[in-house]
From Swiss-Prot:
Belongs to the CN hydrolase family. Apolipoprotein N-acyltransferase subfamily. One of its GO terms (cellular component) is plasma membrane. GO terms for molecular function: N-acyltransferase activity. This is Apolipoprotein N-acyltransferase. Its EC number is 2.3.1.269. It holds the Pfam family CN_hydrolase. It comes from Pseudomonas syringae pv. tomato (strain ATCC BAA-871 / DC3000). InterPro entries: Apolipo_AcylTrfase (IPR004563), C-N_Hydrolase (IPR003010), C-N_Hydrolase_sf (IPR036526), LNT_N (IPR045378). The chain crosses the membrane at residues 24-44, 58-78, 85-105, 125-145, 162-182, 192-212, 482-502. Residues 230-470 form the CN hydrolase domain. GO terms for biological process: lipoprotein biosynthetic process.
Amino acid sequence: MRWITRPGWPGNLLALAAGGLTTLALAPFDFWPLVLVSVAMFYLGLRELSPRQALARGWCYGFGLYGAGTSWIYVSIHTYGGASALLAGLLMLLFIAAIALFFALPAWVWARWLRRNEAPLADSLAFAALWLWQEAFRGWFLTGFPWLYSGYSQLDAPLAGLAPVGGVWLISFALGLTAALLCNLHRLRARKSFLAMGVLLLLAPWVAGLALKDHAWTSPSGPPLKVAAMQGNIEQSMKWDPQKLNDQLALYRDMTFRSQQADLIVWPETAVPVLKESAEGYLSMMGKFAADRGAALITGVPVREPTGRGEYSYYNGITVTGQGDGTYFKQKLVPFGEYVPLQDLLRGLISFFDLPMSDFARGPNDQALLQAKGYHIAPFICYEVVYPEFAAGLSAQSDLLLTVSNDTWFGTSIGPLQHLQMAQMRALEAGRWMIRATNNGVTALIDPFGRITVQIPQFERGVLYGEVVPMHELTPYLHWRSWPLAIVCLLLFGWALLAARISKTV
């Protein structure tokens, strides 16, 4: 305990280990109690530190979290980006060192302005607000990297029932509050009224989560729809090879021709690995086949659009043909994968910065949803499904959710299963069915409670068959989003700052 709370390298090393523990609480390990241990160690580790010492302690925690939880970055850079093992390792370490600052800054803010060791109840509430703030901030700053939120650990745990009420961030707030209160219970015993309030605040989110876990916030807006989702399992080395184009198109054509009757036929991200205008004949043929069978065909395909200046913008898109309509352009792009920041400086340095289709433009904000079989479908391409607020905006207008992805970049790492877990949380938050079609897994159907009903294992070629049900009505989260929680956090911050100022003048 003394090493955790005091300054110095022993405490920093424990913070490093504490950050890594969160990874074990998330998919694919799912030992969720460890997230409470991790957050509690972060909280205790800042108790006696100066702001400068807290800055280092927070950075160590962030480095441990991202070092363990995003180790798949090395696979993407080395295996698929063409970088040497040494260079890939160096780039990964630089990336992790940079994003670890997401924890260094809130740790400094905590030690500088918010910490109130003399008032454990107020301290616990303020810490919960800070914990939520750091998660929201790292999902927003510089387009965001909303990965490894602590709330995802509760997908199959007691707090899952809070997701439709306030999203994954409400769960994270509850975890931060729980961890801090557990650390402070012995200090609350001095005053029985404070102890009673502390126990009430400790139990409330867990009781509410369990009570709401099986509550249905939405209801069907139509009959079940049959789905056939294709998983081609195409190697990334073949994906953009022009000599392999016809083989890939033939693969999805034949899988579709041989598939069972379905209302929705879904192909993954960039299943058509050529510009839409170059594949119009192929898409028209497949659309006619789908329409003749009473189905809508939804596929990922790159799209080129004129800008009006004799130039073109390229988009990562989804299009619907057959008994459906609409094209959607991806709005949340993956840095370096789909666009290169500072590209005039970085392009040409290593092949990782010159990957095929790494110069996409961002899709407009006001796009219409896809339509298929008379229903509105909220589309998310790969990385987009990890943004809670962004996903909520589209989900609120929809009957069904759809995410298409190419998780080949992750290799055999834990990345694809983390990605799947976040998609499950989006379905739970929205109270809607989700269709998830990927190139190499995990292709799955997810129900409104975030549970997988059917799936195809990773690295297998096949067709997933199942049913989804269009849903209407809004969960509280889709209706209010995170505004109530944001207001509560601001009030808690204000309370902590005011109380600290008063205590200094007394």
